[in-house]
Amino acid sequence: MSSYHLSTKERLLAIVDDIEIISKELIENTIAPKHQKMSSADHGQLVELLVSKDKELKATLQLAAEQAGIEKKMDGLREQVKEQDEEINQLQKQLKEAEHILATSIFQGRQKLSSINKAVKRPVSSEELIKFAHRISASNAICAPLTWQQGDLRRPYPTDIEMRLGFLGKSDLNINGHNAPNQNNLNEMQRNAAGAGAGSGVADIPASAQNQFAWHPSGELHMTMGAGAGSVSLDTRSHKDASQDDVEVMSTDSSSSSSSDSQ
């Protein structure tokens, strides 16, 4: 087998074996009897062969040192490649996240464009929006009126009676170690409250306020001051006037916006 097809390690081992055999022959020839010694020509060839093997061993050792340096450089390059692979993987993850965010943004943008196109095809006048907003605010379905005070029958949401009948109103019982009333007890309390309100002619007034505020047949709201102290008439016209002013302001705004739209 040619030495060029062997690895550096195998070549070094083969050269060492050859040097060992040649050295053994020379030593045996040296200690052999005179009549058994080889001729001087053969001895000279063995010496030349040993010198050539020594040169070949030195050249192979130098080649092995060069290959060791190359292997060291390759190890460093492998580490750099590993680091670059980690950076590439990290960038790939960031790219996927950016792609997901971009896809989501594109989807949302298309939805907004679709909504804009629908709004352009089916426009709604500002007068209709103002009327709709006025209907919502006039019914006090979202919040109490700005001029609402204690005793005002314009309903703020939720009412006191509803809060007292709810779970939040019974939270003190749970804290003290008692069980909350069941649904039947709540329904019974609601029926009792409704019956009390119907019997006294007062609607949507808390139980705590039924003994304090009452409507008289004249249309005035009276507040009871205490046992035997009589009652005091409350003026609710300011609330009605304020509500009327709010309606007039809304009507004026709607008419002005309608005129501006028509222009």
Swiss-Prot record:
Bias (Low complexity) ranges: 251-263
Ranges for region Disordered: 221-263
GO BP terms: regulation of transcription by RNA polymerase II
GO CC aspect terms: core mediator complex; mediator complex
Source organism superkingdom: Eukaryota
Stretches of the chain forming a coiled coil according to its record: 62-106
Keywords on record: Activator, Coiled coil, Nucleus, Transcription, Transcription regulation
Subcellular location as annotated: Nucleus
Family matches, as PANTHER family: MEDIATOR OF RNA POLYMERASE II TRANSCRIPTION SUBUNIT 4
Family: Belongs to the Mediator complex subunit 4 family.
Its job: Component of the Mediator complex, a coactivator involved in the regulated transcription of nearly all RNA polymerase II-dependent genes. Mediator functions as a bridge to convey information from gene-specific regulatory proteins to the basal RNA polymerase II transcription machinery. Mediator is recruited to promoters by direct interactions with regulatory proteins and serves as a scaffold for the assembly of a functional preinitiation complex with RNA polymerase II and the general transcription factors.
Protein name, UniProt field: Mediator of RNA polymerase II transcription subunit 4
Species assigned in the record: Aedes aegypti
Gene it is expressed from: MED4
